[in-house]
């Protein structure tokens, strides 16, 4: 029998979300290409080239940072530390997002930052007077309204689950706590309204740091190992033609070499050959993974006719062979694509008669 998450949570059971992240696979592939002993945990978190890449908005393919909105924020903010990168990721959410102009203004003119009360300064100083993290809400509730750690966490969970009724229920207790601490009711109400607006979609700090770390690592690898970065990125998007086109367009703009299809060298994945990226057979329309496996089994090929004979014997159909010719997979044999396509049926007939004799 299965129960939905909220009932299990009410019973006191621990609920964990395990989410797959293909970017971790991309990072692992890049590390292995650089050096099997390369340790991503030892890269510096203050790499100049990485922050230049982020500030210059060269963010295509970088986790959490490649959307138009995030690129616009990166252009305006130009983060210069890992902590600021994590803040940027936390800010770009429906709750904190409305405070982005104030955040940028305060960051540029820190001497002008004003706090509703001096007790907020140690809580909000790191984020330039703006509420960015759920933990800051908890600290405000504890410091100003005398909430216990447990009660502050109830408030945090109500925010993260967007439970409007529960948030409204906690309001009198928050106001009362503020009044008992000597704050006036206007300030207490203003603080709680801030909390409610933030509740739209606030991140906890650990979440932002974790996302920031993956984003930073991908930006670091793109800045310092672009060839390996693009190769792994393309392998992660095989079958997604729109993304593949965008990545290849950027690769060409950066003067990174691309090698066309080779029936002998290409496989089912992008590879690095002579400091260039070799295209895979799998990008050819109508070829498919099953045919790629057959091609891999039939290699090597000494000529166009030899290739067609072996592939016909393996069961690669004429549609796939036509696509491979059009894609340039047989160009290495020195024949024109036109002549190869024109004579394909005859070569297949020859292959069938030869294979029958064998």
PLM region spans:
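Noncatalytic, beta-rich nucleic-acid-contacting surfaces in large DNA/RNA-processing enzymes
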Residues: 1-358
């Amino acid at each position: 029998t299965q129960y939905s998450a909220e009932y299990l949570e009410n019973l006191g059971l621990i609920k964990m979300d395990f989410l797959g992240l293909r970017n971790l696979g991309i990072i692992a592939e890049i590390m292995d290409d650089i050096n099997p002993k390369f340790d991503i945990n030892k890269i510096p978190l203050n790499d100049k080239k990485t922050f230049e890449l982020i500030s210059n908005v060269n963010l295509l393919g970088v986790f959490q940072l490649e959307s138009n909105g995030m690129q616009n924020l990166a252009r305006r903010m130009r983060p210069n530390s890992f902590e600021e990168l994590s803040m940027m990721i936390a800010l770009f959410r429906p709750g904190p997002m409305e405070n982005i102009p104030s955040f940028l203004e305060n960051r540029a003119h820190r001497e002008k930052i004003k706090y509703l009360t001096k007790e907020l300064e140690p809580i909000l100083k790191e984020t330039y007077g703006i509420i960015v993290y759920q933990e800051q809400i908890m600290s405000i509730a504890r410091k100003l309204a005398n909430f216990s750690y447990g009660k502050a966490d109830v408030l945090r969970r109500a925010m993260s689950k967007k439970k409007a009724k529960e948030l409204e229920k906690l309001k009198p207790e928050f106001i009362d706590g503020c009044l008992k601490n000597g704050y006036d009711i206007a300030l207490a109400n203003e603080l709680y309204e801030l909390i409610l607006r933030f509740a739209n979609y606030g991140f906890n700090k650990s979440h932002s740091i974790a996302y920031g770390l993956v984003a930073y690592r991908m930006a670091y690898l793109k800045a310092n190992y672009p060839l390996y970065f693009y190769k792994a990125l393309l392998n992660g998007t095989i079958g997604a033609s729109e993304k593949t086109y965008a990545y290849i367009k950027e690769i060409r703009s950066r003067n990174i070499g691309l090698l066309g299809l080779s029936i002998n060298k290409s496989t089912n994945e992008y590879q690095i050959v002579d400091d260039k990226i070799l295209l895979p057979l799998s990008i050819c329309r109508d070829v498919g993974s099953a045919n790629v496996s057959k091609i891999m089994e039939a290699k090597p090929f000494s000529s166009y006719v030899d290739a067609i004979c072996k592939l016909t014997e393996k069961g690669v159909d004429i549609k796939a062979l036509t696509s491979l010719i059009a894609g340039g997979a047989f160009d290495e044999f020195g024949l024109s694509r036109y002549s190869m396509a024109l004579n394909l049926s005859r070569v297949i007939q020859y292959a069938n008669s030869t294979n029958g004799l064998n």
